[in-house]
Amino acid sequence: MCDDEETTALVCDNGSGLVKAGFAGDDAPRAVFPSIVGRPRHQGVMVGMGQKDSYVGDEAQSKRGILTLKYPIEHGIITNWDDMEKIWHHTFYNELRVAPEEHPTLLTEAPLNPKANREKMTQIMFETFNVPAMYVAIQAVLSLYASGRTTGIVLDAGDGVTHNVPVYEGYALPHAIMRLDLAGRDLTDYLMKILTERGYSFVTTAEREIVRDIKEKLCYVALDFENEMATAASSSSLEKSYELPDGQVITIGNERFRCPETLFQPSFIGMESAGIHETAYNSIMKCDIDIRKDLYANNVLSGGTTMYPGIADRMQKEITALAPSTMKIKIIAPPERKYSVWIGGSILASLSTFQQMWISKQEYDEAGPSIVHRKCF
């Protein structure tokens, strides 16, 4: 099926923060752009400028100074379908430059998403974009495919949602899935807040993007939070400077590790929830006693929010403290984990055994959107 570019399947990982899209069988996504739709805040005065009423992705990012930026996907759930359609349209026609009606399309979603969300996704794919076939896969399961395992527990932390999914011999264990609506975007908001304490004010949607960049470039996870706070208070060795787009230079110190510490202590942002190390442990404890050993030995990290330096060591330390003392614990943090969901999708969609799993246009016409629950796990 994948010999020719004509009928290659498309893989589109719609994250809350980034869309990763490309062709099945490739080893990396061709298009990676922010899931943003921007609309002008001001009246257009120059005629013939070809101004649009909305901008998508990188174009919205580059004109962000005059736009209001909105993310149509919040916490992994699509909240604005009109904007989402714009993003898909942009993905197919501008980024990949393909006609969706010629390619089967694999989409991804977070586990424990509302059922209506997948149905509407299915409906738009078949009715608006006329795809010949489609499938909706769970993100964390794809990450496991990408790491070459069939057993393990995935911690998938993106921009909108973090979840732990234990998979045993290729089966996800739905009763043990843990979902935490705390992820990259919440960390960005928290960083905006604690930078205000230093006297740097960031308020607009465009300035939030600057803070996101600061977060991605300078934040790290401390192995021991209290010690690190003491070090930061007594010396300036942890301080780093960052140049804003207008040339101002700001200095940040303990904010560098206070921001991602929220993942381990959600009470920092007022969330009454266990940290990611505890949800991972709780998820393993909900699984059958016989398979826990294999899960402890295969903790796979995936998603952009697991890209902080030091996060793997910290997870190792925290889970070791919770688990039985004789247990062997291994955290797997592949360097390409930012895209591992997409890579897993690319692997899945190009398997010969997967070809009968697609939902075809014909099946959709017969059964309607609810077919997605029967055919996609």
Curated annotation (Swiss-Prot):
EC primary class: hydrolase
Protein name listed in UniProt: Actin, alpha skeletal muscle
Superkingdom to which the source organism belongs: Eukaryota
InterPro entries per UniProt: Actin (IPR004000), Actin/actin-like_CS (IPR020902), Actin_CS (IPR004001), ATPase_NBD (IPR043129)
Post-translational modification: Oxidation of Met-46 and Met-49 by MICALs (MICAL1, MICAL2 or MICAL3) to form methionine sulfoxide promotes actin filament depolymerization. MICAL1 and MICAL2 produce the (R)-S-oxide form. The (R)-S-oxide form is reverted by MSRB1 and MSRB2, which promotes actin repolymerization. Monomethylation at Lys-86 (K84me1) regulates actin-myosin interaction and actomyosin-dependent processes. Demethylation by ALKBH4 is required for maintaining actomyosin dynamics supporting normal cleavage furrow ingression during cytokinesis and cell migration.
This protein's UniProt keywords: Acetylation, ATP-binding, Cytoplasm, Cytoskeleton, Hydrolase, Methylation, Muscle protein, Nucleotide-binding, Oxidation
EC number, UniProt record: 3.6.4.-
Quaternary structure and partners: Polymerization of globular actin (G-actin) leads to a structural filament (F-actin) in the form of a two-stranded helix. Each actin can bind to 4 others.
Transmembrane intervals: none
Cellular component aspect of the GO annotation: actin cytoskeleton; cytoplasm
Modification type Methionine (R)-sulfoxide: residues: M46, M49
Gene: acta1
Annotated positions of the N6-methyllysine modification: K86
Tele-methylhistidine modified-residue sites: H75
CDD domains: ASKHA_NBD_actin (cd10224)
More info: In vertebrates 3 main groups of actin isoforms, alpha, beta and gamma have been identified. The alpha actins are found in muscle tissues and are a major constituent of the contractile apparatus. The beta and gamma actins coexist in most cell types as components of the cytoskeleton and as mediators of internal cell motility.
